[in-house]
Amino acid sequence: MTPEKRFENKVKQFLKEQGCWFIKYWGGGRYTKSGIPDLLCCVNGHFVAVELKSENGEAKALQLWTLDKIDQAGGYAILLFPDKFDEFCKLIIDLNTERKV
């Protein structure tokens, strides 16, 4: 298993443990839209989009553009590297424990 796949599994396991809904977007196919983040999540009513990258990975311009558009629309757009996993976990926990109005 590649380091990127192990990291993806770690993130998905954490989201499951937190009771979050998410879907893995399989891009790159003939009938799929390019630039969509890897994980589309709902965390306590908040839209969270996560683009996963390995330690040395780089986001493409279209991925960054999409994340920016999600951010502008009021969602949480995250470009996630392994060294930022703890910060990601804190954000998800904070969103998950936020009181709904």
Please provide the spans of the model-predicted regions.
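Catalytic phosphate/metal-binding cores of nucleic-acid and nucleotide-processing enzymes, i.e., regions
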Residues: M1-V101
